[in-house]
Amino acid sequence: MGQKTIREISVAWKEYKQPYVKQSTMAAYVLILENHILPNFGESYTLYEQAVQDFVLRKIENGLSVKSVKDILIVLKMVMKFGVKNEWMDYQEWDIKYPSPSITKELEILSVANHKKILNHIQNHFSFAGLGIYISLCTGLRIGEVCALKWSDINVSEGTITVNRTIERIYIINGTEKHTELVINTPKTQNSCREIPM
């Protein structure tokens, strides 16, 4: 078999990967490919460690978090390994270095006083959007889980809320066509399916 570019391999990889992952996961992969990998490496037949290291440092200098850059490299490695498996390219593991963070950001959380203020405001100025925020603040549900709730998930007599789905807006890129879609899915992990006391 002949060599292929990373762009050509990514097309075949997407077709291969699609049946095995959720639509939202595939949309995230495509977004990473289109926005980061293909503009930088799409026409390459192979990738050397130094080119990838320079790419990593450039992305971080331009404001991406280390985690976001690592996510990009995960997708890049999947494409590269798929290319090797099909004998379209050579690939050797890279030893990529990430700059250590100069300052660790402290996680900002809502104070108890502000939590109470928000709940009181929602109670005094009812709206359905406010109700969603209220449920989230009182139960710890993620916003996608709150938006995916149905009346059948709420058991008033038992005082529980059953969580077994989430809703998210995903960005779809299909050739030149780009749009967003709302997708209802199961939560990311099995432990996310749960029953919560009200």
What are the language-model segments listed below?
Residues 2, 14-82, 88, 104:
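N-terminal core-binding DNA-recognition domain of tyrosine site-specific recombinases/integrases
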Residues 4-9, 44-46, 150:
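Short, structural beta-strand-to-alpha-helix junction motif
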Residues 9-10, 48-52, 114, 128-129:
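N-terminal alpha-helical segment
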Residues 37, 52, 76, 97, ...:
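Conserved hydrophobic/aromatic pocket- or pore-lining residues that grip, position, or stack substrates
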Residues 46, 109, 195-197:
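Short aromatic/basic micro-patch
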Residues 57-61, 162-169:
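Secondary-structure transition/turn motif
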Residues 66, 70, 85-143, 147-149, ...:
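Basic, Lys/Arg- and aromatic-enriched nucleic-acid-binding interface segment
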Residues 162, 171-174, 181-198:
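C-terminal catalytic core of Y-nucleophile DNA break-rejoin enzymes
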